[in-house]
């Protein structure tokens, strides 16, 4: 399960 959470985490780390 790494579709929305992965994008959210990447945007948050940006």
UniProtKB/Swiss-Prot annotation:
It comes from Euglena gracilis. It catalyses: diphosphate + H2O = 2 phosphate + H(+). This is Inorganic pyrophosphatase. The keyword Transmembrane does not apply. Keywords: Hydrolase. Its EC number is 3.6.1.1. The keyword Hydrolase applies. Monomer.
């Amino acid at each position: 399960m790494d579709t929305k959470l992965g994008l959210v985490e990447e945007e948050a780390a940006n």
